[in-house]
Amino acid sequence: MNVTIDISMYPNKEDFIPPIKGFIEKINCYEDLKITTFPTSTVVQGEYNHAMKAVQETIAKCYEEFNMAVYVAKI
């Protein structure tokens, strides 16, 4: 089963651009996913389990590197 995930990241810091760029760079490292970046969100498309795992791992990596952020995901 394929899925489309539309995800927005809202970093909890004044310098919000580096965490957003970091998220986009990290999610683009996953193979077999179609990633499309828009000004306000990133769309991840692919096989359900693979796409969900990629988003989960990317959020975890960004939390470790950039600390707190709010994520809004539409699945």
Regions found by a protein language model. Give the residues of each.
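Charge-rich, low-complexity N-terminal segments
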Residues: M1-I75
